[in-house]
Structures are given as C-alpha cells and as structure tokens.
Amino acid sequence: MLRVAVPNKGALSESASEILSEAGYRRRSDPKDLTVVDPANNVEFFFLRPKDIAIYVGSGELDLGITGRDLAADADAPVRERLALGFGSSTFRYAAPAGQDWQIADLAGRRIATAYPNLVRKDLADKGIDATVIRLDGAVEISIQLGVADVIADIVGSGRTLGLHNLVAFGESLCDSEAILIERADSDPDPARDQLAARVQGVVFGQQYLMLDYDCPRTVLDKATEVTPGLESPTIAPLADPAWVAVRALVPRRDVNAIMDELAAIGAKAILASDIRFCRF
C-alpha cells in the first residue's frame, strides 16, 4: 500500500487535501484524523506537521509527501521534488528594522532569528558570512523588539506583518517556495508513485490551463496559431463555410484574456474558454 504524507494544518493543508480529492482519493472526514486508508486506490494517507514531512519521506517510512519547498530545504533530508503544485507560493527573505539601508554584508556578526535554521545556515555559508543563527518556532518578528535578535529570516507574503513590526525585507530571496510533491531522493521507479503523481499533475494542469475554442478565417490561420500554439499543436477542423476553420488549443489560464483580445483583433469569432477538470499528458 502506498503511504503518503499530507499537511495536517496550516496554509498548505486544505489545498493539498482538495487536490488529492480532485485526483480521486479519499478525504478525511474528521480534521482530527491522523490517518486515512483509501482501499479503492490502495493508498494510506498520514496527516503530519508540514515541517516533519520531508524527514519521514527522506527516511523511507513514507513514499510521497506534500510540503513546502522551503520546509523540504530546511529539513535537510534526502528528498527530491517530484512536482510543483501551484499553491502556497511565498518567498523567504531576511528582514531588519526599517530606517537603515540594509545589505547582505551587514549580516556579518549579527544574530538572526528564524524558524528555518538549516536554510539560513546554508545561505550564510554560501555567501561566506559568519553570523549567529537563533532557532525560534514562530512569531520571529517580535524577536528583534525583545532583544533576542538583530535580524530575522522568514516567509514574506504581502509584507504587511513586517510593516506592523517596523521591519523591512532586504536582499534576494533565499527560497521561492510553493507546495511540492516530494519523494525519497534515491527511490527506484514505482508504478504506484507514478500513478498518484500523474493524477495530481492532471489536477494541477487543469487549474493552470483552459481549453480555448474559436472560429478562424483561413486567411489569418497562421497568425492565430502563433497566438495559440497549444502544447504540441492546435486542433484544426473544417467548417461548413470553406473560408473558415474551427481551432482548439490549450492556453495558460493567466493569459486567457490577453489571448482572446489578440484573436478578436485578427478576426476570430465565437471565442470560448472552458475549464479543464482532469487531464493526462
């Protein structure tokens, strides 16, 4: 039976469970459940702390896991990223009190508070900077005010939380994170793992792409297919009027309105975008 780790709480939990449900797997009925067996798919799900998932997968106790790229990196476990899942995006950056033009070189000799000590130590080592890393499990923003640290390293979203504590982010991101599906780094190929990954990838792809259908004059077909090249090639079918063809192609969801504008501008008609629920590629 395939053994899969899922975040039990936090920002990744609900979206991870939703993707697995869309992929045809059983959901837990009670948020307090720590395990769910899905006999129809021969899978057992374990609901664990997101920070621990890479450790369990890296040890080989579990076959796959969903966690954050930042959490997997900080765990320093022998895992590899199988698939990016397209949710839970964030950046991991240094931040310090506003009012000073902070540079990465200013970290030398400083105390840096973080919930991701391994990630920070690796970054400092890569940069050749000697600093003291202080591990805290949360609310690191307050550590500077309390005199525990000079700088923090933490997940940065909108920056609102930093602003509330009069902090400013500086330097490049240590890690551009999102939810990922991981497996043990030295794991051999396995059909059961491949099947779950393919199902999940199909759901993720369906969230990121739309199917676009439109009628196109033959005279501008080359221009239209440049706008909508699809994955390998668009589908083109004749219409009753020989001067027109029907075109179908996958397009990125984020670009669909701009693409529809371009098609309309060159004379395409009846442009229709449709959601994709499930797919395999």
UniProtKB/Swiss-Prot annotation:
It comes from the Bacteria. Its EC number is 2.4.2.17. Gene3D superfamilies: 3.30.70.120, Periplasmic binding protein-like II. Its cofactor is Mg(2+). The keyword Glycosyltransferase applies. PROSITE patterns: ATP_P_PHORIBOSYLTR (PS01316). Feedback inhibited by histidine. GO terms for biological process: L-histidine biosynthetic process. It is found in: Cytoplasm. Pathway: Amino-acid biosynthesis; L-histidine biosynthesis; L-histidine from 5-phospho-alpha-D-ribose 1-diphosphate: step 1/9. It catalyses: 1-(5-phospho-beta-D-ribosyl)-ATP + diphosphate = 5-phospho-alpha-D-ribose 1-diphosphate + ATP. Pfam families: HisG, HisG_C. Keywords: Amino-acid biosynthesis, ATP-binding, Cytoplasm, Glycosyltransferase, Histidine biosynthesis, Magnesium, Metal-binding, Nucleotide-binding, Transferase. GO terms for molecular function: ATP binding; ATP phosphoribosyltransferase activity; magnesium ion binding. GO terms for cellular component: cytoplasm. Belongs to the ATP phosphoribosyltransferase family. Long subfamily. Catalyzes the condensation of ATP and 5-phosphoribose 1-diphosphate to form N'-(5'-phosphoribosyl)-ATP (PR-ATP). Has a crucial role in the pathway because the rate of histidine biosynthesis seems to be controlled primarily by regulation of HisG enzymatic activity. PANTHER family: ATP PHOSPHORIBOSYLTRANSFERASE (PTHR21403:SF8), ATP PHOSPHORIBOSYLTRANSFERASE ATP-PRTASE (PTHR21403). Equilibrium between an active dimeric form, an inactive hexameric form and higher aggregates. Interconversion between the various forms is largely reversible and is influenced by the natural substrates and inhibitors of the enzyme. This is ATP phosphoribosyltransferase. It comes from Mycolicibacterium gilvum (strain PYR-GCK).
